[in-house]
Design a protein with these regions (language model features):
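N-terminal accessory/interface modules of nucleic-acid-binding and processing proteins
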Residues: 1-339, 344-348, 353
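Conserved ATP-binding/catalytic motifs of P-loop helicase motor domains
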Residues: 355-357
Length: 357
């Protein structure tokens, strides 16, 4: 049996080498060796770890931070640098952020788009109808570094995380309701007596989400996101076998989206994942569901972010308009006051007689 370069390098590593460092070596050799099949198989092997609820939540954390990246790149980031928050190549860090790689830091591998000129079988460039050389996009392995591996100019980032307070609760709820309204999904609140065992439910026949009254703000939003995932991204008719996977799908979207919004996710658990995947040797179902979780969470997060911006801009416009009205009212009051003073004659008091001694 041939021994791969990565196996040789792994054998040379100290015993206390971290799992992430070993992953970097394996992935680097598979990616730069153009072994796409081997890389995909290696990443799928990581699915076995997600049967553990805590490990699965850590993976969802990575999706939350990098929801606009491809599924493959999310897997690569999670395997090599699960605590990453913001990544870029060394050149990008230098030129765009004036930051530099810390001495001794090692990058990790992801895939990035690269433009190339198209050639024919004879090696000549192919021209388009305008006589220009045709170009295409391919994805190549590149080295990136997390912000924690860099130093330099302080970053001024617009954080997407929101504190879970009343003001932001109202904004987020408005955004979610607007998204639901576009699909004619009704949202109603019901008494706890009518929903004693659940926080929420979705009824496909009525296209209605029911939420239990009296929940905390974070629970209300997370439950609404969970039920919205059922309503927007799942089939209206499901089999008993599909139920567990559908709950995993909706629960995962709720976790990823809530995490993105800065809501508390500590109460959320995935115990049913362990029971569903128990004794399974084939992880095809889980792989398929994670693909859907990634694409649907990305879609919902982007919709929420866009709608939140609109909600906030409306409030700013409203505040400006309200201020304008208030200023106009004050000016009007001042004018009325001035006119009143001009119209009213000076009040003269009768002269008091001089006191006699």
């Amino acid at each position: 049996k041939d021994v791969s370069i990565s196996e040789i390098r792994l054998q040379q590593l100290p015993d206390n080498t971290s799992k992430e460092e070993k992953e970097k070596i394996i992935i680097e050799n598979l990616a730069y060796g153009n072994d796409v099949k081997g890389l995909n198989e290696h990443l799928k092997m990581g699915l076995k770890e997600y049967v553990n609820s805590d490990q699965y939540k850590k993976y969802l954390d990575t999706i939350s931070k990098f929801h606009n990246y491809s599924r493959r790149n999310i897997d690569l980031i999670h395997q090599q640098k699960p605590d990453a928050t913001l990544i870029a190549g060394a050149k990008k860090w230098n030129e765009s952020f004036e930051r530099y790689i810390n001495k001794g830091e090692k990058g990790f591998t992801i895939y990035a788009p690269s433009e190339y000129k198209v050639k024919d079988l004879n090696g000549d460039f192919v021209l388009d109808k305008d006589g220009k050389v045709k170009t295409n996009i391919r994805f190549i392995p590149v080295k990136v570094f997390d912000v924690s591996q860099t130093n330099g100019k302080e970053l001024s980032l617009n954080s997407v995380e929101l504190e879970n307070n009343v003001e932001n609760y109202v904004d987020i709820y408005k955004a979610l309701k607007e998204i639901a309204d576009k699909d004619n999904i009704k949202i109603v609140f019901v008494d706890k007596e009518l929903m004693p065992r659940a926080y929420g439910s979705y009824t496909p026949a009525k296209n209605t989400i029911e939420l239990r009254k009296g929940m905390g703000q974070g629970d209300t939003l997370s439950t609404l996101i969970h039920e919205l995932a059922h309503a927007k991204y799942q089939s209206k008719i499901i089999t008993t076998e599909e139920y567990a996977l559908n709950e995993l799908h909706a629960g995962s979207i709720a976790y990823v989206t809530s995490k993105h919004l800065g809501l508390d996710t500590s109460k959320q658990s995935f115990g049913y994942l362990n029971s569903y995947m128990k004794d399974r040797k084939d992880f095809t179902d889980l792989d398929r569901v994670i693909d859907k979780i990634h694409s649907d969470a990305k879609d919902l997060i982007n919709k929420i972010d866009t709608t939140l911006e609109k909600v906030k801009s409306k409030e700013i416009t409203k505040d400006k308009f309200q201020s304008k009205i208030e200023r106009a009212i004050e000016k009007q009051k001042e004018k009325v006051s001035q006119k009143t003073q001009e119209v009213m004659p000076e009040k003269k008091f009768p002269r008091q007689p001089a006191m006699k001694n």
